[in-house]
Amino acid sequence: MGCCFSVQFSFDDQTLVRIFNFLCGNINRNSFGVEERPTQPTIGQEEMLEKAWNRLMEDRVGIMGLHGMGGVGKTTLFKKIHNKFAKMSSRFDIVIWIVVSKGAKLSKLQEDIAEKLHLCDDLWKNKNESDKATDIHRVLKGKRFVLMLDDIWEKVDLEAIGVPYPSEVNKCKVAFTTRDQKVCGEMGDHKPMQVKCLEPEDAWELFKNKVGDNTLRSDPVIVELAREVAQKCRGLPLALSVIGETMASKTMVQEWEHAIDVLTRSAAEFSNMGNKILPILKYSYDSLGDEHIKSCFLYCALFPEDDEIYNEKLIDYWICEGFIGEDQVIKRARNKGYEMLGTLTLANLLTKVGTEHVVMHDVVREMALWIASDFGKQKENFVVRARVGLHERPEAKDWGAVRRMSLMDNHIEEITCESKCSELTTLFLQSNQLKNLSGEFIRYMQKLVVLDLSYNRDFNKLPEQISGLVSLQFLDLSNTSIKQLPVGLKKLKKLTFLNLAYTVRLCSISGISRLLSLRLLRLLGSKVHGDASVLKELQKLQNLQHLAITLSAELSLNQRLANLISILGIEGFLQKPFDLSFLASMENLSSLWVKNSYFSEIKCRESETASSYLRINPKIPCFTNLSRLGLSKCHSIKDLTWILFAPNLVYLYIEDSREVGEIINKEKATNLTSITPFLKLERLILYNLPKLESIYWSPLHFPRLLIIHVLDCPKLRKLPLNATSVPLVEEFQIRMYPPGLGNELEWEDEDTKNRFVLSIKK
């Protein structure tokens, strides 16, 4: 027995269309197609896009971070990567794009992801975060997903959200952008990719694109002025775009000249700078949190545009300004300073230049000055006219409001006014042509903490009113013609750092022992050499921790004084071989400069030469802290094999030493294969070494090398390089003189030649 049902349906055309649309809607709700995100054409980012895409597609890469300063184009690049997934039909099941932004909460991230997964019904919204994480995990664990998180400011806890951790097994991906490189490490990407500013020609193309041909063609002069405006953006896409759009309708030469003038004198006043550029960059400043680190950052704006700021001196400023805390031990305070410096570089607010310098991007610097002036309301809070061609001190409406003033690197010859700078704490006058500093000018600076007068080579006398600077902690008189220290200097009870290096006319430091707070003293290259009377005076400085000094006579240093020496110059030992064995006992020696002296080899112990000591103790270096070494006119030395026990050498300079035939001698280092030299070397400079034939007998690994500079070393035909020696080949330079010498170099093989031939610069 059976039953048979026959049912016939008949639909008109409109009904069929409604059914089709309904079914399509259900299909869309259960699929996860990638919709392209709108984005502008990229200029100058094509290579970076390709590199980032290829890295993300590697099977072993589950998490990838892109970091870079604000406005550099990370989001634009990220959108381009996202849109590439739209062309991949089968490799990934779902691509989720989330804009995180500062202060985003876990619940908000869960909600955004849930919407992409079609989980957001009323029942789901009433669940707690843990249950929501379970739901998200249940959906994603069976899918090959890509999660793209744009603009994260801190670690995103994937587990708490419910996102399965990407691995080679599940082949899922998590990519993100951030301004802070530290976040990359916290997220698990220890080799993040940095999005950098555009190269000059790419920057010009972007700027032209924003300004438009009509404006650029309106007057031939405008093209040249436009190039100058573009250059002031220093390759930052945000600035190029906003300023380019602002100038798009400016067809008069005078308008462009005015723009250049405003951008040069006070960029924060330029149209749209204060509402479209600087506030965006300020998010990075706000994220620093700690007020001391913020102060450290703002301090960097005192230096000129594009200035390579020496890390150690910057940190010494910070210590004296009180940004680093109350630690009285310089080494610990400096270590803390380096940590703070690292925070600023990881946040892409400063950029490392080698290991000893940082630089601040010009637009970031304008942001710092804008903040320091209370967003333009108190412009005289920071008076910064550094490297702008001044011949006299600038004017200010209210000198009593000035807290920090930087007039460094100008042409100022004298300052004679009687302005009452009663709130001034920082005064940078270095690198001018200063001859006269009025006592009346500094009379009222009772709050002055830092005074830098260095590199004023004609400056020969400090006014007696210096004794009134009762708060002064940092005084730099290096590279001046100062002849004597004023009697009133002894009244500076808080003076902590005193730099008298290369004061070639200074005859005496008598009375310096009364500076009881002095912790750092530099006399290197001064006319005051370390004779017995000077050393006796220095031994009275009970709080002294760092000493830089030149010795020109064999003296018996007590161990305390020897341990205080961080920078040592040795000069003029020509009568007999000079015993340098005492150097090994200097625990804090970081820089050594030997000039016009007679010695053949440095001893690491009183009875052991470098080679003999190293054979016995190959893993115990003597000069652990030595980072800079310079030799000049040392005609008795034939090699420098002893630098094998200086593992942290960063800078090596050898000149005018006619017997030097090799840097490392193979025979002396025969049994020292466990020691690899130059792992931290950044700069190698060799000048006028007529017998030099070899640096090292085989190729070496130079992880940090930036430059090899060879001048007048006619027998040096081969460098210790192979194709893998220098990882930073894009930044690496080889400079040979005479210029033709570069063409005559012998290479390890053809691959080595091809890798480095473009590194040879004229």
Swiss-Prot record:
A GO molecular-function annotation: ATP binding
An annotated GO BP: defense response
Annotated membrane topology: Lipid-anchor
Superkingdom of origin: Eukaryota
UniProt: ATP binding residues: G68, M69, G70, G71, V72, G73, K74, T75
Domain NB-ARC: 26-329
Compartments in which it is found: Cell membrane
The entry's keywords: ATP-binding, Cell membrane, Leucine-rich repeat, Lipoprotein, Membrane, Myristate, Nucleotide-binding, Palmitate, Plant defense, Repeat
One cellular-component annotation, GO: plasma membrane
Record lipid sites (S-palmitoyl cysteine): C3, C4
Residue numbers with lipid attached (N-myristoyl glycine): G2
InterPro entries the UniProt entry points to: Apaf_helical, LRR_dom_sf, LRR_R13L4/SHOC2-like, NB-ARC, P-loop_NTPase, Plant_NBS-LRR, WH-like_DNA-bd_sf
LRR repeat extents: 401-422, 423-444, 447-470, 471-493, 494-516
Domain remark text: The LRR repeats probably act as specificity determinant of pathogen recognition.
Sequence similarity: Belongs to the disease resistance NB-LRR family.
Its job: Probable disease resistance protein.
Protein name in UniProt: Probable disease resistance protein At1g61300
